[in-house]
Curated annotation (Swiss-Prot):
The gene is norR. Keywords: ATP-binding, DNA-binding, Nucleotide-binding, Phosphoprotein, Transcription, Transcription regulation. It comes from Escherichia coli (strain SE11). The modification 4-aspartylphosphate is found at residue 57. It comes from the Bacteria. The keyword Ion transport does not apply. Required for the expression of anaerobic nitric oxide (NO) reductase, acts as a transcriptional activator for at least the norVW operon. Activation also requires sigma-54. This is Anaerobic nitric oxide reductase transcription regulator NorR. Residues 187-416 form the Sigma-54 factor interaction domain.
Amino acid sequence: MSFSVDVLANIAIELQRGIGHQDRFQRLITTLRQVLECDASALLRYDSRQFIPLAIDGLAKDVLGRRFALEGHPRLEAIARAGDVVRFPADSELPDPYDGLIPGQESLKVHACVGLPLFAGQNLIGALTLDGMQPDQFDVFSDEELRLIAALAAGALSNALLIEQLESQNMLPGDAAPFEAVKQTQMIGLSPGMTQLKKEIEIVAASDLNVLISGETGTGKELVAKAIHEASPRAVNPLIYLNCAALPESVAESELFGHVKGAFTGAISNRSGKFEMADNGTLFLDEIGELSLALQAKLLRVLQYGDIQRVGDDRSLRVDVRVLAATNRDLREEVLAGRFRADLFHRLSVFPLSVPPLRERGDDVILLAGYFCEQCRLRLGLSRVVLSAGARNLLQHYSFPGNVRELEHAIHRAVVLSRATRSGDEVILEAQHFAFPEVTLPPPEAAAVPVVKQNLREATEAFQRETIRQALAQNHHNWAACARMLETDVANLHRLAKRLGLKD
């Protein structure tokens, strides 16, 4: 089998049809998977010695949340080091990063694997991975044909990175130095709420406005502040963190503004406060709603005039600090109740951001679960940590009152429990490993299987045929919706339907 001009043209056309980078990436790997008839494909971005999935096809959703560090994945490291097509033999001793992550094939190891490093000039920018369950699945394709595929993928990724850089620099003031744009990979999530939040971060990061970040406990407000700072012209200078809720009233002023020797008992030397430490950088004030009214007045003065006074000193010090504040309270209600100054609220909330709770983020919970699974795998030296279908279903139907922080702790606890019940370095997280209270799951709809004299293969095919028919009827013969309902990949479903005689 070889690639025709029509095949390559079709891939190029699909790239042009995409609306936005993400859509183009998805069209690329979906088309490649169909052309190559492989079981899974993925487009990865290379950054800081790790591969970050941008688009996947035929893999579990949580793969999009995983971050594949080279030191923990020897196959990906081999791809990164290679300057050309990498074919891994079926008996390769190097573990495949996608073992257990192909839906419906969790218990099987990936047999065929091809890695295509993607370059922009001499710089590695990503990789395309192709995986199959048959050992000789890619033998029919020559290296030259695979290089053509790599060139198309590299061009698409390189153009996307260039456009991202140019768009971010257009947001800067005319005399500002170029800076790195917000990377979509820094904040995990593809839900509408997170997509909008990322756009707002890109917009406000280029300015010097104060930002008020609101959200429930555990939603990741500190991560938002970090993303704003790292994508701003101040990124070369420090980001200083201060938790206002952990400040005793007696030392709060000193922590913020510093003190001079002898200012109070125990002040044995001069000490800089957080504002001085953040000069020319960013100060992140977490739980800003916990500050006393007296400290709020002093903070307001700094925001108005840009100078501070150390405790015990009459002299003023000029500082250039951008303030990012976060709260889990409704500060408007706090203002009405007289617990927060209205003038300070308006100074801080020049550009308000709201971080959505995890229960409103849809499939983001699975992406985040994949991220935490990969963290646990690296931290505990395991070969793989994967979620069972039951565990994924449970996570998607739990409300997570503690948000992302609760999910992180739940994954870590589940990994420990799973390791205690089975030997080896492979962990499969089941629903029973999670101690969530009163989670109501939708009842499974079991298809009635008639009792007839059939051999095992015929009975299995009859069951598959009837299950697909029922799913198609429930989804108005929409194959993509049917595949989602059956928790399988649409390309695999089409192939199975053809084999079962359900479609031509």
